[in-house]
Amino acid sequence: MSINEEDYLQLEKEIKLDDIDFSDLEEKYEVNIGLDNYIIVDGAPIAPEAKVPVLIKVLRKLFSQVGEIVEGDEGIYMPLENGKSKGYLFIQFKSTESADLAIKKLHGKKLDQNHRLLVNKLSDMEKYGVDGAVNEEFIEPEIEPFQSHGYLKSWLQDEQGRDQMVLHFSETVGVYWNKKSADPEPVIEPRKGFTSKYAKFSPKGTYLFSIHPQGIQSWGGANFNSIKRFFHQQVRLVDFSPNEKFMVTLSPIPISLPDSTVDRAQFPFGPESEGHKLVIWNMITGEPVRTFALPPHLEGQKEMPWPLVKWSYDDKYCARQGPDALAIYETESNFQLLDKKLVKVDGIQDFEWAPAGVKLHNSKAVDGKHVLSYWTPESTNQTARVALMQIPSREILRTVNLFQVSDCKMHWQSNGKLLCVKVDRHTKSGKTIFSNLEFFKTNERDIPVEKLELKDVVVNFAWEPNTERFITISRLDDGNPNPAIPKNTISFYAPEVTKGGVNHNSKKKGGAAIAAAVAAAAINNQSSTKYKAYTKIENKHSNTIFWSPKGRYVVVATISRTSGELEFFDVSFDDETNKKSLPANVKLLKTDKFSGMTNISWDPSGRFVAAWSTSWLHAIENGYRLYEFTGNLLRDDSIDQFKDFVWRPRPPSLLTNSDKKKVRSNLREYSAQFEEADAMEADAAVKEIILARRKALEEWRKYRAKHISKQGNSKNEVQAEIIEEIKEEIIEEKEEIVE
């Protein structure tokens, strides 16, 4: 039956299409017009039409690594113009996820030396490429107002010259003033949840850092206000450059770029950092300046050697050790490799920068040269070697060949004049270990090396700051490792100069004269210097050495799970009964037992020593003790769940040598002032008496000045003034009981 047009139109009017459900058909025949699985790649090479198929093949192989590309010409389209490609192309992936991954992984990828690929979604190009989508009128960016954090070195202005310390107990962290035997005075209110792991000061004490799952937070100023945030998820280890310009962080979790474009814009890392775990930060801007992947041999290690990045004394260079090579970077050239290549050192085991500029013989450099030391083990056709290298020239200044070497440890003296290499050697049978000490004298011609051969194994070595004296702890390798038997020997070494150095028959006595003689020997660069153990203490459990930062005083301690002991020594003791003047005159000042002790630290002034037991290792006598440099116990504070004690470092003194000389000449006057201040702080009654006397004296001076001005300048009167000063001193006190 046929229907004419008129009837069809009438029927169409009668049928209500809105009542019919077409959803199944719409879903079945839906046309996908979305562009989310398309990307546009810019920065590709401009190639002749004949070479375009080869270029497409290369790019297809590259982008297929992140996802499946549609086959044929629909998968990759590269426009041509005048017989050449136009430098960009379109790629269609089979899924949106593959397109997102391509942008995340390959944006910024260097195809070769001259071409870097820029990858974006086609939908973004369409979004921003349409006329009017982007405002062409320049809008001045809003600059955030400067936010002052106060004076970052405000603690140095303390009138009493006190040092600050961090006490970490339970979940609370507090910063306190050291008040000797009295309760520490809080600088700010202690904060609960201040850090999720530990708190740490920068090397000069300017910043305090807290560790969090999201990264690191820096604090500073008088009230420890928030300064910068450094985003690095699950960071574990932190280190700093000596001058506080840079910070290094390490996380076990590799860096992963966010999927969201908005989040990626706020993310501090770019595609080149994908998968990296080690980050160097600029501490001023808070931005990452370089990231690194961990070397393959360190991946999966439970105990990570730290630091992985080591710095020159002035922050100008930093270096990383890799397999058979050193990577040295110039911080002033955006952390580019020195000369754009690695320093090849086959088998390198360890390296250390000189902690100060090395003034090489006949060098006119005021600040000294950058020098690092490294060692390599024995191989089939080569001996073990220790070498000194100058940077940036890479010149090898000195090399020493060593035989039958088990291990080496390099110890630079604080001013860079000496390097001691502790060489653990084995006998031909390999059953016995003993140590040699190799001393490199960097200031002398050709850098001579003095050798000190020992029969014992040196388990610890430490230089006295700024001198040639040092201490070793050693033991005889007799095959009996029983820790209950005290077998360690503490040896105090000093230079024995045989020609024009230390004068052993000097008429000047005392520690000051001895220290001056030792310093003179170092300055005179006597190549005939030998090192002699002036004092040995045998049969000890001692295993650690802690020199005062000012020298002369040292704590030799036993730190173990079962026992703890501190021994305080003066290595320049003024002994008037001893007529001999020696480079080292050692006196045991005090001994104290501290079971459960885990750590020891000197304050920056060298006046106080803190020892503590941390709950991070065990629950035995958690808390801390505070000692004077002579070993007198000032404070014993047991604190449940005590975790850490951190002194706040101080920057180097700004005083010139003439200023320091002036202070030393007026030391008695300053000592009297300090003793008065100590007496006031220790006893409230004494404080009231002293303040009352000061007030009375000030009133008398005002009264006297007032009446002298009234008398005028009379020539006929003889103006005489008698001032009586009475000093009371208690010589001796005795208490007698009268029955």
Swiss-Prot record:
One of its GO terms (cellular component) is fungal biofilm matrix. Pfam families: eIF2A, RRM_1. Signal peptide: none annotated. PROSITE patterns: RRM. This is Eukaryotic translation initiation factor 3 subunit B. RNA-binding component of the eukaryotic translation initiation factor 3 (eIF-3) complex, which is involved in protein synthesis of a specialized repertoire of mRNAs and, together with other initiation factors, stimulates binding of mRNA and methionyl-tRNAi to the 40S ribosome. The eIF-3 complex specifically targets and initiates translation of a subset of mRNAs involved in cell proliferation. Residues 1-224 are annotated as: Sufficient for interaction with PIC8. The keyword tRNA-binding does not apply. SUPFAM superfamilies: DPP6 N-terminal domain-like, RNA-binding domain, RBD. One of its GO terms (molecular function) is RNA binding. Residues 1-98 are annotated as: Sufficient for interaction with HCR1 and TIF32. Residues 37-124 form the RRM domain. GO terms for biological process: formation of cytoplasmic translation initiation complex; translational initiation. Component of the eukaryotic translation initiation factor 3 (eIF-3) complex. Belongs to the eIF-3 subunit B family. It comes from the Eukaryota. WD repeats lie at residues 190-229, 231-293, 301-339, 343-385, 453-502, 537-579, 592-630. It is found in: Cytoplasm.
